[in-house]
């Protein structure tokens, strides 16, 4: 998993509440088990027509937001069915963090497990962040748990264990590999 320490990027506002996992990545695209390739179908029903033509009114299709790597959204992001593919699609598209009012618990944990930082902020902060210019960089400083713009700073909470995993780029396999010598020694001793 890629390390997440201090990240700078531009944002796209998608200020809907209750964006569910089927809206993030519809079920017809869940046939693969590889994490790559889901980004092209992210928000499929909103981004494309049935003929796969781009909807010019959807935020991600607007030229000024095409390179955004931070998503600003409303409450209850990632609700609905449990599908890790939703986090995969967001990450594969290029998002590194989501800043929203709240998340479903399963989506929140799936995001963290895949190196995608879900940040909770109050409505006032979300409104301020959503109004930023599409060209203004936002800095996310994970070690200091801080979102910085050119004019404001917003503090955020994160579990210290998840914070450490993200800063060190450790997924579950990476954590296990830290104990590889001890595991090998145990296996040799108990053959």
UniProtKB/Swiss-Prot annotation:
The keyword Amino-acid biosynthesis applies. PANTHER family: 3-ISOPROPYLMALATE DEHYDRATASE SMALL SUBUNIT, 3-ISOPROPYLMALATE DEHYDRATASE SMALL SUBUNIT 2-RELATED-RELATED. The gene is leuD. HAMAP family: LeuD_type1. Its EC number is 4.2.1.33. One of its GO terms (cellular component) is 3-isopropylmalate dehydratase complex. Catalyzes the isomerization between 2-isopropylmalate and 3-isopropylmalate, via the formation of 2-isopropylmaleate. Keywords: Amino-acid biosynthesis, Branched-chain amino acid biosynthesis, Leucine biosynthesis, Lyase. This is 3-isopropylmalate dehydratase small subunit. Pfam families: Aconitase_C. GO terms for biological process: L-leucine biosynthetic process. GO terms for molecular function: 3-isopropylmalate dehydratase activity. It comes from Lactococcus lactis subsp. cremoris (strain MG1363). It catalyses: (2R,3S)-3-isopropylmalate = (2S)-2-isopropylmalate. Pathway: Amino-acid biosynthesis; L-leucine biosynthesis; L-leucine from 3-methyl-2-oxobutanoate: step 2/4. It comes from the Bacteria. Heterodimer of LeuC and LeuD. Belongs to the LeuD family. LeuD type 1 subfamily. CDD domains: IPMI_Swivel (cd01577).
């Amino acid at each position: 998993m890629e390390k997440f320490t201090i990240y700078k990027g531009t944002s796209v506002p998608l200020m809907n509440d209750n964006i569910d996992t089927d809206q993030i990545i519809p079920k017809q695209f869940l046939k693969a088990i590889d994490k790559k390739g889901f980004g092209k179908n992210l928000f499929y029903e909103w981004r494309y027509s049935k003929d796969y033509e781009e909807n010019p009114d959807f935020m991600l299709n607007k030229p000024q937001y095409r390179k955004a790597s931070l998503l600003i959204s409303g409450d209850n992001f990632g609700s609905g069915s449990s599908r890790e593919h939703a986090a995969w699609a967001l990450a594969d598209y290029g998002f590194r963090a989501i800043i929203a009012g709240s998340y479903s618990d399963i989506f929140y944990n799936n995001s963290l497990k895949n190196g995608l930082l879900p940040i909770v902020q109050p409505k006032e902060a979300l409104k301020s962040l959503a109004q930023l210019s599409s060209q203004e960089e936002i800095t996310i400083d994970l070690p200091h748990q801080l979102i910085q713009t050119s004019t404001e700073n917003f503090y955020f909470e994160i579990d210290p264990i998840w914070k450490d995993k993200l800063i060190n780029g450790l997924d579950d396999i990476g954590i296990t590999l830290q104990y590889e010598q001890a595991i090998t020694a145990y296996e040799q001793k108990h053959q």
